[in-house]
Design a protein with these regions (language model features):
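Single conserved hydrophobic/aromatic residue that forms the stacking wall/gate
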Residues: 1-21
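Beta-strand-dominated extracellular/periplasmic modules and repeats
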Residues: 23-181, 190-202
Length: 203
């Protein structure tokens, strides 16, 4: 299941957002109609692993009062380790990984917690300006029964020098930028298999 609108950026927190993703999934082009709730993006092909550094993304979804939100649907989609989306409209000349779809979904538990297993996405060139590259990022879509539209954002990774040159990231007010960068979770890092990152979401 994969969206052709992959490069659309929408800010998540309503204080600094005026846009949302379309809630009408019929308007989105998909590669597969076999939607399933799977938070392990490493299991696209049985007994085969995608190329790249394995990572875990975990976090908590809360409201502005700090209360955890249960049953929130979180979708993610991303490029593979070479910076290539599994998207027929992607013109980047990197190779498609046959063992990686680049899409996952899960629901928050009663404590508002969620978790994904995936690979670290690669940066990729894009046509916004000369020599332009997008930093490593993962797209997030947040769906709540009480939200009429899907809220979307992008999660970035710490210490990525390409953030300094990315017009999408830099269009965000400085005081909010750090909220879009995942935190490396050294305490829960699983050596040697996974790097662990924390990304909390406030609705």
């Amino acid at each position: 299941f994969f969206f052709s609108s992959r490069r659309r950026h929408t800010r998540l927190v309503s204080d600094w957002s005026s846009d949302v993703c379309s809630s009408d999934l019929s308007k989105l082009k998909v590669f597969s109609k076999n939607f399933n709730m799977n938070n392990n993006l490493l299991l696209f092909k049985k007994n085969k692993s995608p190329i790249g550094q394995k990572i875990i993304i975990k976090g908590k979804v809360i409201n502005r009062r700090g209360n955890p939100l249960k049953g929130i649907i979180i979708e993610i989609w991303q490029a593979n380790a070479a910076g290539k989306y599994r998207d027929k409209n992607d013109t980047h000349d990197a190779a498609i990984d046959p063992n990686f779809l680049g899409y996952g979904a899960t629901k928050t538990n009663s404590n508002g917690d969620y978790k994904f297993k995936t690979i670290l996405p690669g940066a990729y060139p894009w046509g916004n300006h000369k020599n332009a590259w997008r930093p490593k990022h993962i797209h997030f879509s947040i769906i709540n029964e009480n939200i009429s539209n899907r809220l979307c954002t992008q999660m970035y990774f710490p210490n990525d020098f390409l953030l300094n040159y990315d017009p999408i990231y830099n269009s965000i007010a400085k005081k909010y930028r750090n909220s879009l960068i995942a935190k490396f979770d050294k305490k829960n890092n699983i050596v040697p298999n996974y790097l662990v990152f924390t990304f909390d979401i406030v609705l």
